[in-house]
C-alpha cells in the first residue's frame, strides 16, 4: 500500500484467531482496556461495546468494541458462534507488536495459530 501521508506516523496491526474463553460484552471491554494498558497506550474514555442483538445474519452475531486512544484507537470484532476474534490496533505512536500479539493470544486463550499483519 502506498503511503499517502509519509509525514504522519501510523502503526497498524491486525490480529486474528479462535478464542476458547467464555466471552461477553464486559469481557470485550476488559480486553480493550487491558491491551491498551499493557502496551502503554493512553485511553481518554472507557471502551464501548455493541452487539447487534439478533439483527443481521446469525453467523455474524457477536460484539464490536472500540477504545479511543489519545493517539488513535483499538477496535475488536468478536464472532460468538464460531468463536473468532479480529482486533485492529491503530496508533500514531509506536508500540511493541510482538507484545500485542502475545497478550492477545493469552487473553483470548487462542486455540491454534494467531495470525497478525502490520501495515
Write out the residue ranges for each language-model feature.
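Polybasic/polar functional segments that serve as interface/processing modules
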Residues: 1-119
Amino acid at each position: 500500500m502506498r503511503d499517502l501521508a509519509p509525514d504522519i506516523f501510523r502503526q497498524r496491526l491486525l490480529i486474528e484467531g479462535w478464542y476458547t474463553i467464555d466471552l461477553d460484552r464486559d469481557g470485550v471491554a476488559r480486553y480493550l482496556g487491558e491491551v491498551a494498558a499493557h502496551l502503554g497506550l493512553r485511553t481518554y474514555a472507557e471502551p464501548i461495546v455493541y452487539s447487534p442483538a439478533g439483527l443481521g445474519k446469525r453467523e455474524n452475531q457477536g460484539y464490536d468494541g472500540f477504545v479511543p486512544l489519545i493517539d488513535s484507537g483499538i477496535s475488536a470484532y468478536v464472532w460468538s458462534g464460531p468463536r473468532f476474534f479480529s482486533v485492529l490496533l491503530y496508533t500514531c505512536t509506536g508500540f511493541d507488536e510482538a507484545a500485542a500479539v502475545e497478550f492477545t493470544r493469552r487473553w483470548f486463550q487462542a486455540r491454534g495459530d494467531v495470525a497478525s499483519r502490520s501495515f
